[in-house]
Amino acid sequence: MNELLHQHKAIPEDERNFALRPSLIEEFVGQSEIIENLKVFIKSAYERRATLDHVLLYGPPGLGKTTLAHIIAKELKVSLRSTSGPLLSKAGDLAAILTNLQPMDVLFIDEIHRLHRNIEEILYSAMEDCCLDIVVGEGCGARTLRIDLPAFTLVGATTRFGLISNPLRDRFGIPLHLEFYSVEELMLVIKRAAHVICTDIDDSGAYEIASRSRGTPRIALRLFRRVRDFMVVERQSIIDNHFADSALFNLGVDKSGLDKMDIKYLSFIYEAKNAVGIETIAAALSEDVGNIEETIEPYLLKIGFIQRTPRGRILTTKAIEHLMNYKYI
């Protein structure tokens, strides 16, 4: 049971890194339209002493879906229980979690698009009627046992919205699409992190890191921590644009935020001279197709470096110019 479900606790071995994650909705940077609406929904539910409608958070990885799930529970002043789609392989797994929820609790299911269909069907009645229908026995002796559940809020998170079945998708009253961050928003994320861990950084340094963070807070914080490591070792008093540029160069991150895997991806397509299928690319890079579609391609599409066609992936002129300017090809 503990492997399937855990209550949210700070990570004891690195509480400072955990503190980089905002815990209140007022501390959350970016996604302004979503946040303003979410404030209304949460306040309404809290004042009515009712459960918040089920929430579906979807968008590219690293934009704050898990953070928002924690914030929702904290703002509602209830407990958060979390698990993930791949862990729920049997009906009994989900039943054990649901029957252990307290009234008004928030259940967070990450990677909800990876739920088995039989698990989804159990969720339907739980989400709509707060009850659990379980088939007991087999064949002619089979019967349905109904178990009442406490009212709860399900928060689902996914990077693959299209893989969620329509019946499950329609049961979420609050679907929220998270989008890539602007450089200015990422600068605020980095400055907040610098303040939390007592690191001096000026606007130029924050901009240098933010502009290479692929529009993603998780990447911005990771790059900031690595630049901070160089700062500590090299006895630098402050992170400015020159120091950040040097550290990021050592990390293999170029001015557009591309890393070595991105360059391998783009170079392979360039050398093919024609459109290339995703399976061929995955085999050449020894990467999983899902990982390429979820972590590499969204940003390259956003900055206009690749196009998806019926025949496969092709590079844009902008991408080819970038590869040539940096002498990658």
Swiss-Prot record:
GO terms for molecular function: ATP binding; ATP hydrolysis activity; four-way junction DNA binding; four-way junction helicase activity. Residues 1-181 are annotated as: Large ATPase domain (RuvB-L). Residues 182-252 are annotated as: Small ATPAse domain (RuvB-S). It holds the Pfam family AAA_lid_4. InterPro entries: AAA+_ATPase (IPR003593), AAA_lid_4 (IPR041445), DNA_helicase_Holl-junc_RuvB (IPR004605), P-loop_NTPase (IPR027417), RuvB-like_N (IPR008824), RuvB_C (IPR008823), WH-like_DNA-bd_sf (IPR036388), WH_DNA-bd_sf (IPR036390). ATP binds at L20, R21, G62, K65, T66, T67, R171, Y181, R218. The RuvA-RuvB-RuvC complex processes Holliday junction (HJ) DNA during genetic recombination and DNA repair, while the RuvA-RuvB complex plays an important role in the rescue of blocked DNA replication forks via replication fork reversal (RFR). RuvA specifically binds to HJ cruciform DNA, conferring on it an open structure. The RuvB hexamer acts as an ATP-dependent pump, pulling dsDNA into and through the RuvAB complex. RuvB forms 2 homohexamers on either side of HJ DNA bound by 1 or 2 RuvA tetramers; 4 subunits per hexamer contact DNA at a time. Belongs to the RuvB family. This is Holliday junction branch migration complex subunit RuvB. It comes from Anaplasma phagocytophilum (strain HZ). The gene is ruvB.
